Amino acid sequence: MSLPFLRTLQGDRFFQLLILVGIGLSFFVPFAPKSWPAAIDWHTIITLSGLMLLTKGVELSGYFDVLGRKMVRRFATERRLAMFMVLAAALLSTFLTNDVALFIVVPLTITLKRLCEIPVNRLIIFEALAVNAGSLLTPIGNPQNILIWGRSGLSFAGFIAQMAPLAGAMMLTLLLLCWCCFPGKAMQYHTGVQTPEWKPRLVWSCLGLYIVFLTALEFKQELWGLVIVAAGFALLARRVVLSVDWTLLLVFMAMFIDVHLLTQLPALQGVLGNVSHLSEPGLWLTAIGLSQVISNVPSTILLLNYVPPSLLLVWAVNVGGFGLLPGSLANLIALRMANDRRIWWRFHLYSIPMLLWAALVGYVLLVILPAN
């Protein structure tokens, strides 16, 4: 293990917090470390590994610099650029999933900082909120939707129709907030920025490897897909493999183990046993609250054991993606890629009010809209 890798872990406060939480939970549940590897969602870990390699490959190719230069020339004001990036993040998340959308828009946003004066952290926060709002529209936008859609019996179009009111309300709210938080002042460009030199061969290689990886995911052969992607970069551009933030994978592994330990707590098991008897407001608040603690995908998996895949459930777990950092794994991905500690607390200044508003508006819509 390299010294830079160790130094990164030593400075990673969130990872250290997860370790401390895991140690604390171990005192209240049976100590069975042999079961911990099974608690890790290896499909997610492998998928993230491939996406991180591919994104880093495009970044090191210099293509984001080329694309960023074209973008800043097209948008005259900070507000227009921010609105475009938020809409792009939301749109991409509807068919590429929220995580993949972030792996595209966040590196591009970071590149824009070198070309012009923009509040990068604020824009990344809005992009994280945008993929949570946009991805809830379609059955393939995020993992919780995939799970519930598979059990609901709804058609693709039918699922979109039931999610459209909430998605529309959240996107309208986010765009209005974006309009208020990003000024309409003219873009200020950095002087002396050299014309970017990019590597077309590496870009095309990334595109080819991306197609291979997506095909492998489609056929449930994600491990072989990762092997091919890693081998390709090892041969073509070894720097890509060495530049990836591999500590993010350890953070996810620690989160999965902590969630596993948390669900073993007798108190939580007792609460879950009564979920099927809750009223609609009670289930709404329970699903949202549980998502804040263990993330919305594990919450969905747990709750589907006790309640049917209803409209209320799918809306609640998607609303639960806002708020606290653990609400959605997409939040963690976006903030980690920003590589700035200040963004962690600033994120909650926007995300928590968004959660409260989404919980209120979502439940009102459930009450006033005709039942499906």
From Swiss-Prot:
GO cellular component, as recorded: plasma membrane
Localization (cell): Cell inner membrane
InterPro entries registered for this protein in UniProt: Cit_transptr-like_dom, Diverse_Ion_Transporter
Pfam family, one: CitMHS
KW Transmembrane helix (keyword) present: yes
Keyword Iron recorded: no
Regions annotated as coiled coil: none
Keyword list, A-Z: Cell inner membrane, Cell membrane, Membrane, Transmembrane, Transmembrane helix, Transport
Family stated for the protein in its record: Belongs to the CitM (TC 2.A.11) transporter family.
Record-given protein name: Inner membrane protein YbiR
Organism annotation: Escherichia coli (strain K12)
Gene name per UniProt: ybiR
